[in-house]
Design a protein with these regions (language model features):
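Short loop/turn segments at strand-loop or loop-helix junctions that form parts
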Residues: 46-47, 108, 113-115, 141-143, ...
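Short active-site oxyanion
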Residues: 69-73, 157-162, 256-257, 295-298, ...
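Active-site and donor-binding regions of nucleotide-sugar-utilizing enzymes
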Residues: 42-195
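A short, gly/pro- and small-residue-rich
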Residues: 123-143, 224-235, 315-326
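Catalytic binding pocket for nucleotide-activated donors in carbohydrate/polymer assembly enzymes
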Residues: 271-276, 303-376
Length: 376
């Protein structure tokens, strides 16, 4: 069912990609055999088309600095703001280029933070699922898994290996998603290595909600199809950004607030506004997300796994969860993690509760409470 839903969304561009695949496939196989004869191999590393600030980037940097004997290549769009930075570290392949096609087909391992790292997701992914392509694919993940997602079932991705960032997550994936025991590896996340040298700004607050499948163009639709600005998601978060009590507290204490949408929701970033100059709506590539996590003193999120990164640095946060039932029904079903029993901060269903905890945390000099510190 999962694969069929993806195939139903094929476009003319996808059909062109299939044609390109059938042209490049025999060349890629021949090149792979040539490398095998020469006893050579390489790894292909990436995140998404424009990204280089997550586990893929940090793993690539580690390989280039400390494991130079192994050839690695990073795949990135030439227009990415990170392109020159990554190019200084090691070898970069332009996303979508013929070289990307060739190397994807001939790499010993494809290592990515996303399930889709090929030149054409709709071309390669079904062929990987049915076994036509049997390349080794390693999923670095882009955060610690907290909820259950259908896409992570082994039958829906045929991943060779999945990396885990936390022990409970590791045990959960081993038992619940159909992977062999050796395919699930607990190493921690590469990006966590960069969270030890943080220097926080005492007056910086970040708001980082995750996405909603029913509000994204390529997501799974639910029965409610409405204009985005009529959605509860928009009303709650935009309401927080313009709440009189919130603005008064922020301005009175000279706090700076940055609102940073998940990449899947960035299409709606222009819909959000605030009447306070202390509150800034951030576009995806205007700020580096990891730097924001390191600099901020307090976080407001909803269900996002960035809360784990924040708790890793022993910083306070709150989960603003106004749509719990709908989220569990249409986006990510409840897994091993309970936000109430295992979370790194309290949960709130309304703006007033969020503001109340923010004030409490501010009075405590943004120190993480003992209960949540023990959980972290």
């Amino acid at each position: 069912m999962y694969l069929l839903r993806r195939l139903k969304k094929l476009t003319v561009t996808d059909i062109i990609s299939y044609s390109a695949f059938f042209l490049m496939y025999p060349i890629g196989i021949l090149y792979k055999q040539y490398l095998k004869i020469r006893r050579k191999s390489f790894w292909l590393i990436c995140e998404d088309e424009y990204g280089a600030n997550d586990n893929g980037y940090h793993f690539f940097g580690y390989m280039c600095r400390y494991q130079k004997q192994k050839p690695v290549f990073y795949v990135l769009n030439r227009k990415s703001r990170y392109y020159e930075e990554v190019n200084k570290i090691g070898n970069v392949i332009r996303w979508g280029s013929l070289r990307h096609w060739l190397y994807y087909l001939s790499a010993q391992s494809i290592i990515s933070t996303q399930l889709g790292s090929s030149p054409s997701l709709k071309t390669f992914f079904p062929l990987e699922i049915i076994g036509v392509l049997q390349n080794k694919r390693v999923f670095l993940q882009h955060g610690v898994l907290l909820n259950y997602y259908e896409s992570l079932n082994y039958t829906n991705n045929k991943l060779s290996c999945i990396i885990c960032g936390a022990k409970p997550e590791y045990e959960y994936i081993k038992s619940s998603f159909g992977f062999s025991e050796k395919a699930v590896v607990y190493t921690g996340l590469a990006r966590f290595d960069e969270l030890h040298d943080y220097k926080k700004q005492e007056n910086l607050i970040i708001i980082m909600p995750t996405w909603r499948s029913w509000l994204t163009q390529n997501g799974v639709a639910c029965e409610e199809k409405i204009k985005f600005t009529d959605s509860q998601y928009y009303k709650e978060f935009n309401g927080l950004l313009n709440n009189a009590q919130f603005i008064e507290f922020v301005e009175k204490n000279n706090l700076q607030v940055l609102f940073y949408l998940h990449r899947a929701m960035q299409q709606y970033v222009s819909s959000f506004k605030s009447r306070s100059s202390n509150i800034t709506i951030v576009k995806r590539f205007d700020k580096d997300i990891q730097n924001l996590l390191k600099e901020a003193s307090f976080m407001i999120t909803d269900y996002s796994s960035v809360s784990v990164d924040f708790a890793y640095m022993k910083k306070p946060l709150i989960y603003f969860q106004f749509d719990q039932e709908k989220f569990k029904k249409y986006h990510g079903r409840k897994g091993y993690f309970s936000y109430q029993d295992n979370g790194f901060g309290p949960t709130a269903e309304n703006v007033e509760s969020v503001i109340e905890f923010l004030k409490k945390s501010y009075k405590n000099n943004f120190r993480l409470e003992k209960l949540y510190e023990e959980r972290a």
